[in-house]
Amino acid sequence: MAKPFRSYTGGASMSIPPHSFFENTVADVPSPGSCTHLTGADHVASLRAALQSLTGQLGTLDRWGSLLADVLCGPARGRLLAAGNGGSAAQAQHLTAELVGRYRADRPPFSAICLTAETSSLTAIANDYPADELFARQVEAHGRDGDVLVLLSTSGRSPNAVAAARRARENGITVLALTGPEPNPLAAAADDAVCIDSPWTATVQECHLVALHLICAAFDAAVLAEPARVASGPTLGAAR
């Protein structure tokens, strides 16, 4: 039975698609003979076009930053979880580093965990459970009702990311997805998604990095606009 979710943006609820929707979701890997090789000019042109699709979603990224501020600065002092595969794993860790450390201005640290960074847990889960459990089991362990999970997938079809989105929603965790072109299973499984309209993996990843920085900028703006809700600590003023 599909389970409806609560949209934090106030929109109508939808149902999580049944598991069969996510079968056979691994991205196709082109062979050397069929792969189109881009020149530098081609790459820049593809990035320029993809940034146009991102520009149309700036309001969504601003809302995400404000949402993170509400969750991480709220009475429960919630947590951000983040995950992805390959290059998206590195970007997930980049996001959590910006919150535990800082983005621009000095401010207190906030709780943010990258689910790809703890190798012992990753290998233990991969050894003992199906591959789709790689992130989902960590979400169940670390996430709490009201927390936020950010998932990155250039294809939007990574089975372990989709499984993590489903597990998070079952546990009251808001899921935000950064993906490639829509429609895709991860965007459908998330509470909200920013989808980059480009067929090139590298271009999508580059736009995801811009999106992450925009989220951090919106987060900082929301936090620093209301300093009273952020407890001061020994780290303030310690930046070199």
Regions found by a protein language model. Name each.
Residues P227-R240:
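A short, charged, Gly/Pro-tolerant segment at domain boundaries
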Residues G40, V44, L61-G65, A92:
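Hydrophobic packing residues in well-ordered alpha-helices of helical domains and bundles
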